[in-house]
């Protein structure tokens, strides 16, 4: 039986969101109403190369009768009994509730190990609930944001010993070495799997017109009225022999501009589409390049770890192209430095000019998003970076020691830096390394993630 992890907790703490994050596709219905997930859902999950079975359970309800809540609780108890480890989720924004306390007490009496996970920890709003959760007596909580993908490395760390005990990881391999590339993850086109490409942007910027140009047919509804495309529409086609899947979505507007319930659902579907895509093309109107809402969408794409390409539509009517491009680059530099160097293509969706350049940019960005760097090459680069600019000294004048770096995964490129006292490495030095990775290994415009943790250099031990 594979290593099995059960996700448990009271209703509406984000269990299905975490399940979807780990499984990598939307198998569980996500809604902000308690009790949406009434049955157990199972899927194969992957976390930094660790493979396991994950179970999304119904929310615990404090009800001992034969109500549906009682049956949901019975299903959850069964899932916990069959799991190697359980993740008890709480909502750090809501704080610890009496139900959280009740079921923490209940789980303590069961033999299955329990890891406390404080969800919705993005930003400052979740901090009080995170600190309060220590009072549950379940050990140190793992702070995550299932919605934004934050804290996944820390979750890996918490699960690692349990995975070793279950035989899912070997003790020698418990530090996350670069995982073997799955088919299609090494930057080479995989003819058996389409590249998923989403077209997103504000309403009425020409997303569906662009989609129709790519497909060569009027497959997507177009018109001057904003909001014509309510649902995300997926269409497969071939480009130069490469299978592609195009997803055209409803436009993302500012929240204050979203009035009806159907459009709210469409915006939610767009956000989900971004998460499930590989390359996201953000379409902008040349008359209003990179306004506040464009930046919000671009940040969302980067936070979700997707590959980003910018497409400036209606370029054929721009009076001063050079000034417009400079304004765009300056705004990116100041407002979205993590997307510095992102591929930017000017085009006309109506006439088709620039479409081939757009597809070149999509394929090139996808290749970089899949890039893997050999550990030896990575550490030669790291030595050079440290020699050029050593990390600042620790309090008392002690030298900060960086041991080595490894790439944990691609899609997006994710690196782990092993060092003494990882919590004391300044954020500015992490940025220095991330910028260096982008420049040295040709990763402009691709999300690059760097985690810092303590640990010995296994390569030094092997040499000895």
UniProtKB/Swiss-Prot annotation:
GO BP field: ribosome biogenesis
EngA-type G domain: residues covered: 3-167, 195-370
Residues at which GTP 2 binds: 201-208, 248-252, 313-316
Every KH-like domain range: 371-456
Keywords of the record: GTP-binding, Nucleotide-binding, Repeat, Ribosome biogenesis
Residues that coordinate or bind GTP 1: 9-16, 56-60, 119-122
Source taxon at top rank: Bacteria
Family annotation (InterPro entries): G_ENGA, GTP-bd, GTPase_Der, KH_dom-like, KH_dom-like_a/b, P-loop_NTPase, Small_GTP-bd
GO MF, one annotated term: GTP binding
Keyword Acetylation annotated: no
Acidic residues compositional bias, start-end: 172-189
Region entry Disordered, spans: 168-193
Record's function text: GTPase that plays an essential role in the late steps of ribosome biogenesis.
PANTHER family (alphabetical): GTPASE DER (PTHR43834:SF6)
Family under the similarity heading: Belongs to the TRAFAC class TrmE-Era-EngA-EngB-Septin-like GTPase superfamily. EngA (Der) GTPase family.
Subunit structure: Associates with the 50S ribosomal subunit.
Protein name: GTPase Der
Organism in which the protein naturally occurs: Paramagnetospirillum magneticum (strain ATCC 700264 / AMB-1) (Magnetospirillum magneticum)
Gene that specifies this protein: der
